[in-house]
Amino acid sequence: MFPCRTVIAPETDFLSAAVKADKAGQAISLLKVISAKDLRDVSPEVLNDHLNNSGLPGSEDFYSNVLNPRVANEMITPYKAFFQKEIPATEAEAFRKNPPALVEWCRKEITINNELNSQRIPMSPMGVWKARVADEKSRNIFFVSMARSLGIPAWIDEVTGKIQYRSFNDNDLKNGKVYDVDFEAAQQTQAPTGTLVARY
């Protein structure tokens, strides 16, 4: 006979701490946007970083595009507190008010070298920050991670692969405009929108 042992999942400890910090609702929302596979692998350190450094909901896509630690197929890491510490407050505020400035910063500061990553395993966002050299995919993940750390809703579209963000310029994130990121363009363009009408 083997002795019985209770195994407590990392998210149980995480939720207990969140309840004590009066953040239970946001903690549950965070767990909801993380896939079942990621929940098995994610550490409490990652969960706490993204819960405590994502701000408060301000847009309809806050949970999926700010709070969510997953960007693409990178290893999930606790990067938000790191970026909030590393980026000077005045620069962070400038990026929030003008996200194209963040696009331009990435274009100028991150050197692209796709040949250094022949296995196509994405670098961590913090690794890109420290090295200032990355392949294009790692740079894209880095941009989204940095934007989310600043409270800017950002994502990589699962269908088109486009990097996108919702603009703060409208001061109304519920109706904020979505922009495509183009690191080669001098100016960022608004993503095309339209209405689909289906009759049957």
Where would I find each of the regions flagged by the language model?
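Beta-rich nucleic-acid/ligand-interaction surfaces
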Residues: 124-127, 131, 161-170
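Juxtamembrane segments of multi-pass membrane glycosylation machinery
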Residues: 121
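Glycine-rich phosphate/pyrophosphate-binding loops
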Residues: 151-163
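N-terminal accessory/pre-domain segments preceding catalytic cores
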Residues: 1-115, 125-128, 138, 148-149, ...
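A conserved hydrophobic secondary-structure block that centers on an alpha-helix together
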Residues: 132-140
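Extracytoplasmic catalytic/substrate-binding loops of multi-pass membrane glycan-assembly enzymes
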Residues: 118
